[in-house]
Amino acid sequence: MSSIKTIVGNIDNTVLSFTVGNDVVLDKKLVDFDCISTAAHAYMLMQLPKNNPIISKEEFNSLLISLNKIIELNNEKKFKIKEVDQDVHMAIEKMITKEHGELGKKLHTFRSRNDQVATDLRLLAKKELIKTVDVSLSLIKSLIIFAKKNKNVPMVGRTHMHPAMPSSVGLWASAHAESLLDDCNCLFSAYELNDQCPLGSAASYGVPFKIDRNLTSSLLGFSKPTHNVLYANNSRGKVESIILSSMSQVMLSLSRIAQDLLIFTMPEFNYFKVADNFLTGSSIMPQKNNLDICELIRAKSSSVKSCELAIYDIVKSAPSGYNRDLQETKQPFFEGILTTISCLEILTSLIYTLKVNKNDMIKAFDSKVFSTDRTLELVAEGMSFRDAYNHVKNNLDDLKNIDPREAIKNKTHLGAPYGLDWSYYTVRTNQISKKLKKEKINFERKISKLLDSPYKVI
């Protein structure tokens, strides 16, 4: 069996292919972040030791030019990671060494691929969480616009999928918006846990030299470095599963919106109308217009959850310290993020096309939907609730069908159809937008300053 020479030694060809796996493809997502973390690490090396720095100012400036060039090549899809490179880290080191000789050989001083990839993944996660909150806000805003526009349109409220009580389109749409507002809090919680820099923890056990981990953490826009160097590496996989757990909550909200739309756009209901260009057809049935988008979102909510659980299962029995098992967490991590963002984007576009069929909404009401309203009228007249309940239950056929537009006007308490406080949604949305803007600007400023080149998250 033949071997091939790599930066870390001679490896059998078959072993190399097996161990590299899909990293030559997956690691393309990490190229920018590996360049960014390398710049921060090199800046620290420029400070150590003070009397004779490992990297000179001139070398650092030359390095920045090369790292920005690699980022540009990657954005143009021209940067290549070969199997012999094994991963993005060695591919970049090889290119820097080819261009700058000794400088490239110095870059791995005090650094392991273990803390290197952990840092890259956390940088990627910062960017993707910011983007996820941003697109979540877009969907929230579209739902609130739709809700306010149709706030007084009556809609049969359902429990167990059967008609229950008078409700409104405004209540339905804003309920889903409120769910997503809570999901944004979950995303920010994951962001806070992720916002710690593992760089400098090396292979899990630190290095015998007083490096400045606070410096690299600050340069990269993290709120702080991870403390324990062993946990810095042990947290890999755990942090990714937490991030996907927050995204699973987003997908749970999207799945329920999708399911409602699938039901309420059926001809039997015809409550809502989706733009024709958001529907697909059948290869054999000419009349079909299918809301495949919502069916796929419903299924993809399970896909994202499975990505989260895949990562959890990979790391749950791993011993302390780095283990190659972690390589298998990349694909589900990237897939879960991409799926969540794409579902948010497509559903936002769909909501903006959504129309309400008011007449069909009103026709859906029958007298029994007002059973609870009638029961509470009798209570207001002096009858005990249970007696009123039994009286109405025993005389359902005698109930009168009233105008649902008038019925929902009686529900004025906090959070009811006519008691919705629209400023509540404005305040919460603005709070999230403000926090998002702060994190986005801080991250962009830090990375732009480090690279001496403009960097945009979104």
Each model region followed by its residue ranges:
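Charged/polar positions within long, soluble alpha-helices
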Residues: Y43, Q47, E72-F79, T97, ...
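Short, well-ordered beta-strand elements within core beta-sheets of diverse protein domains
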Residues: Y43-N52, L171, S241-Q249, R374-E381
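A helix-coil-helix interface module used to build multimeric assemblies
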Residues: M1-G206, I211-S218, T280-G281, D292, ...
